[in-house]
Every structure is written in C-alpha cells, then in structure tokens.
Amino acid sequence: MTKTPFKTKYGQGSKVCKRCGRKGPGIIRKYGLNLCRQCFRELAPKLGFKKYD
C-alpha cells in the first residue's frame, strides 16, 4: 500500500503561481494576482505597475 500525496489546504505550500506553478513564500496574492515574484517582475509593466525610485 502506497501513501497518496495530500493537497495542502492552508499555509505557504497551498499557494501556487498561476503562471509557472511555483510554490512558497514568494507568491504575490494582492489584487488576486497569485503570481510568484519572478513572474510578477516580468509582467508588471504590462499590468500597469510602475517602478519608482
């Protein structure tokens, strides 16, 4: 009998990037983005975010 992997319902492991599927603490969920920080940096200009000095 093998163990079946269970789906995490809460915590950092339950949040995934909707673009690349990466898990962990680098997920940006504000405004319903659900992107990891690397994907967010690539898409931010297209989404209308501006980088200020």
UniProtKB/Swiss-Prot annotation:
GO molecular function, one term: structural constituent of ribosome
Keywords: Metal-binding, Ribonucleoprotein, Ribosomal protein, RNA-binding, rRNA-binding, Zinc
One GO CC term on file: cytosolic small ribosomal subunit
Obligatory cofactor(s): Zn(2+)
Binding site for Zn(2+): 17, 20, 36, 39
InterPro entries: Ribosomal_uS14 (IPR001209), Ribosomal_uS14_arc (IPR023676), Ribosomal_uS14_CS (IPR018271), RIbosomal_uS14_euk_arc (IPR039744), Ribosomal_uS14_sf (IPR043140)
GO-annotated biological processes: cytoplasmic translation
Pfam families per record: Ribosomal_S14
Family: Belongs to the universal ribosomal protein uS14 family. Zinc-binding uS14 subfamily.
Its biological purpose: Binds 16S rRNA, required for the assembly of 30S particles.
HAMAP family xref list: Ribosomal_uS14_2_A
Subunit relationships: Part of the 30S ribosomal subunit.
Stated name of the protein: Small ribosomal subunit protein uS14
Organism of this sequence: Methanococcus maripaludis (strain DSM 14266 / JCM 13030 / NBRC 101832 / S2 / LL)
Gene for this chain: rps14
